[in-house]
Amino acid sequence: MDGVWVATSRRYSTTSTVLLDGSGGAVVVDPAWDPDELAAIPRDLAALGVRCVAGLATHEHYDHVMWHPDLGPAERWSSAGTVAHLAVERDRLLEPLSSYLTPDLIDLAGRLSALPGEHLPWDGPPALCIEHDAHAPAHLALLVEEWGVLVSGDMLSDVELPMPADDDVTLERYVTGLERLRDAAASARWAIPGHGTPTSRPMERYDADMRYLDDLIAGRPSHDPRILDPEMAELHEANVRLAAAQASSG
């Protein structure tokens, strides 16, 4: 992927994505996770001869709104909904970071501004921000169509099952959000999930997620291999309950 760099954290296969604008600037998407890993990102940018000109947080969860002072004072964008929710729920949303980050890094987390439109403001090729409510309210995916690159946030993962938002009572909102990504996944040559590995077959990831959800909603057993991961057992059981609630609601 020319112009794209991806680092993977030791924690939960969390990805940090860097997009190079071709003019010496870099946009850092969802930098994570441990202090040494965060510090490595600006060092790597310096080694590439570029500087951070902007950040992007795909959604409000604590592992996607981190930052490092050496990245500088660049504007850090997210959806208006994410910015608004962090303004009123910052302490609750960021509380888990106390187990991982130093106080100065926690203070930097979640300092975001609302995107001025549906495209990322940068000097690179047009980058469309696709908003939906699967996984988290006002979640963003970023499609750089010229490059065929989809940065999908916590969607289209090879290691995580579909993970609805905490307040979802059925799978309906997740399915609707996933459908919002279909055209982007179909047009992209690469998808970069927030957890897991980038793929050159984005539609396979999309189809796997939709097949899993369809099976649960229809009351069929799913044979998705991600279910075999012990760390996914609790999430799978919760998804089965949401599917049952959806079926009972008609």
Question: Where is each model-derived feature located?
Answer:
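Catalytic core of the metallo-beta-lactamase
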Residues: M1-L48, C52, M66, I106-T176, ...
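Residues at the C-termini of beta-strands that transition into short coil/loop
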Residues: T8-R10, A80, H195
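Active-site environment of divalent metal-dependent phosphoester hydrolases
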Residues: D34-D36, E60-M66, V83-L86, P137-H139, ...
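Short, solvent-exposed loop/turn segments at secondary-structure boundaries
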Residues: R90, P162-D166, M203-R205
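Generic beta-sheet signal
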Residues: W77-S79, S152-G153, G194
